[in-house]
Amino acid sequence: MALTLSLNTNPLVNRFAEPDDLIETVARDLRLRDLQLTHEFINPSWQASTIRRLTRDMDRALQRTGVRVTSGMTGPYGRLNHFGHPDRDVRRYYVDWFKTFADIIGDLGGKSVGTQFAIFTYKDFDDPARREELIKIAIDCWAEVAEHAAGAGLDYVFWEPMSIGREFGETIAECMKLQDRLTAANMAIPMWMMADIDHGDVTSANPDDYDPYAWARTVPKVSPIIHIKQSLMDKGGHRPFTAAFNAKGRIQPEPLLKAFAEGGAVDNEICLELSFKEREPNDREVIPQIAESVAFWAPHIDTGAKDLKI
């Protein structure tokens, strides 16, 4: 199997809401088959009847267009403490929330759900004993979600390494250390990472920790999905792969594919994670610039466009 290209729906949140509008735009205008669906489109906290209706609507749109939801991820309004929250009842809420999310994604044909491993407060992260206690609690929370997700037909759950210690996975060494611990937890289905090659602690003494290519060489065997965007030296945003950004960006197809291959990539999903400001003219450039980004990668990574029905 070959690498496949997908899109995280972050930049489509609020700009689209109805399943038909979202999915038809992806097929017709972006010419891309695979989506990582963020939770805002079918929010697990909504009423069950609303979730069921919108999930049915989205599934019909997927069947009609050939678009696929491959996974579910928390979106721009879901970067929260979750299983790192100090309050037990709040953590309980999010365990149930992610179980519902797993059901939604499973019903849409996706194979995984995830978010950050946990986000700790200053207070909890800075206390070594409390930090370790809360890490164990977070792993237990994920194990419960994984057990439910297995029943929903998912293949794995995932965590996203970030760029600071209290969000976890901030260096390659810390990232692999936590991954080893999660693998050893032997959950009902595996918990893999979903690495973003543009993340990493820019204050690290090891330059590999903020080198996208070093991450690309390291993570493929433990990161079925890998986020990419056009990386600038200032780490200034989730830039699209447009001609203007490509001219000054670090990420180019040939060296990136070489790095992935060196890391053992075989059938990984390479997921575009982009964002656009709610300002003019950016707000109306979203679809054209994502389409340009997809077209930029199309000669190198399978977009699945041949499977689209519109």
Swiss-Prot record:
The record's EC number reads 5.1.3.38
Q: Does the keyword Isomerase apply?
A: yes
The UniProt entry's coiled-coil ranges are none
Annotated S-S bridges: none
* Gene induction: Induced by erythritol and repressed by EryD.
- Could you tell me what reaction this enzyme catalyses? D-erythrulose 1-phosphate = L-erythrulose 1-phosphate
Q: Keywords on this record?
A: Isomerase, Oxidoreductase
Question: So, what pathway does this thing act in?
Answer: Carbohydrate metabolism; erythritol degradation
Q: Which GO molecular-function terms appear in the entry?
A: isomerase activity; oxidoreductase activity
Q: Does the keyword Oxidoreductase apply?
A: yes
Query: What does this protein do, in the record's words?
Result: Catalyzes the racemization of D-erythrulose 1-phosphate to L-erythrulose 1-phosphate.
* Name of the protein in its database record: D-erythrulose 1-phosphate 3-epimerase
